[in-house]
Amino acid sequence: MINHEINKLLAFSLKKGLIQEDDKIYSSNMLAGLFNLDNFYFEEISDVPSTATAILNQLLAYAVKENLINDTVAERDLFDTKIMNCVMPRPSEVINNFNRLLNNSPKEATSYYYKLSIASNYIRKDRIDKNITWKTPTEYGDLDITINLSKPEKDPRDIAKAKLSKSTSYPKCLLCKENEGFYGNINHPARQTLRIIPLELNKSKWFLQYSPYTYYNEHCIILNNEHIPMKISRITFENLLSFIDILPHYFAGSNADLPIVGGSILSHDHYQGGRYTFAMEKAPVEKEYSIKGYEDISVGRVKWPMSVIRISSKNKTKLINLAEHILTSWRNYSDKTQSILSHTGSEPHNTITPIARKRNEEYELDLVLRNNRTDENYPLGIFHPHNEVHHIKKENIGLIEVMGLAVLPARLKSELALIKENLIEKKKDISNDSTISKHNTWYKYILDNYKNISEENIDCILKKEVGIKFLEVLKHAGVFKRNSSGLSAFDKFINIL
């Protein structure tokens, strides 16, 4: 069995271009050594699978049976990455292939690199495919909703082992370049299948890789050569526009650089990008402005639940100058009527989530105004999801959510299934069920507003209402509200520019 599965993996790796014919003996010996085999022979494989998942599952079952590993998620992940490492091309080979294709076509280069990242199982597509996704139509466009099931639950045995393992500071974080080829441990994922592509952005060294948890098509991470903190500045705009010069079919954006309104990793400067059109990109400009000194740059307020200024021009330098001017002005802007205070003492609150793209041969920047202030009423953040939406989403609203893609917690899968049962049975109250009592107010709203709930329409109803809740989340995160007071305050800010 093991001999046959190794042959299947070799055939798969040849088919996907991970190895060449001349690499077969080398890779087979690497695999035989990994499994402590005394001998190996080649077989003809007629039916080559399209993914490595089934082969890896068979090889992992053998490793468990032979006591090479314990049957836990973490140990299986560490070991299957070791397996795939035996059939991986060297980093220099991947870089050379990427750059050769890039000279001809940026789309071909990223397509090659993305397919390689999936074939190598670095992007665990079998897990990502478990995510529950749908679109919810709203007045702001179709919002993308994802219930994130791709990160498996931690095994108690792995948790216990992690407590006993020695903590190390290498690599310093999950985004450091030193992750490439890293063997991994119980506290840090193996990255032997990671290949990173060096890029020069604005005369500084960066790297391109794909996110192992792709939330949208070709979801990439652009990471700084140095382990330095996130900082939104003029350099950010220069780097983002430099990136879309290299890969004009991608967008690139940055999380904000302050807690609450930033992403989950603020310690390592990085951006995210990819080949996907979000609802925010499709959202129209609802009001145009002219800014003195920048009359030749298009400036507009985007029709979006959060507060977005869209600027566009063919002149990259002028666009960067205006973006910097808006950022500097916003950093020090306060409007008490909208609960916006730029500082508490010396602590700054205002920042921007920027997104760059090319549209009709022009550079375009969406600048999303953010504020991370807290108060007694909103201890988690005034412009952060409020209590009434925490049953659906209470985590930070980062770059991906800002653009209109909800990444919702895995718990919702089972909770929505229970809510569905109760709604079909027309139960008046769910406050006694500890698993879903947090949804009680929302549950009653659905019960009151939909008179003919049935098996046939319940899924559509719940998907629609979850999407509407996410829209509410985005409205909470908007600094200028979508009412007459908020929109006139938005105009007031733009007029001071």
Curated annotation (Swiss-Prot):
PROSITE patterns on file: GAL_P_UDP_TRANSF_II
One Pfam family, short name: GalP_UDP_transf
Any one GO BP annotation for this protein: galactose metabolic process
GO CC annotation terms, alphabetical: cytoplasm
First-listed, main subcellular location of the protein, grouped into a coarse class: cytoplasm
Pathway per the UniProt entry: Carbohydrate metabolism; galactose metabolism
Subcellular location: Cytoplasm
EC number: 2.7.7.12
Reactions this protein catalyses: alpha-D-galactose 1-phosphate + UDP-alpha-D-glucose = alpha-D-glucose 1-phosphate + UDP-alpha-D-galactose
An example Gene Ontology molecular-function term: UDP-glucose:hexose-1-phosphate uridylyltransferase activity
UniProt keywords, alphabetically: Carbohydrate metabolism, Cytoplasm, Galactose metabolism, Nucleotidyltransferase, Transferase
NCBIfam families: galT_2, PRK05270.1-2
Family stated for the protein in its record: Belongs to the galactose-1-phosphate uridylyltransferase type 2 family.
Protein name: Galactose-1-phosphate uridylyltransferase
Organism: Clostridium acetobutylicum (strain ATCC 824 / DSM 792 / JCM 1419 / IAM 19013 / LMG 5710 / NBRC 13948 / NRRL B-527 / VKM B-1787 / 2291 / W)
Gene transcribed to yield this protein: galT
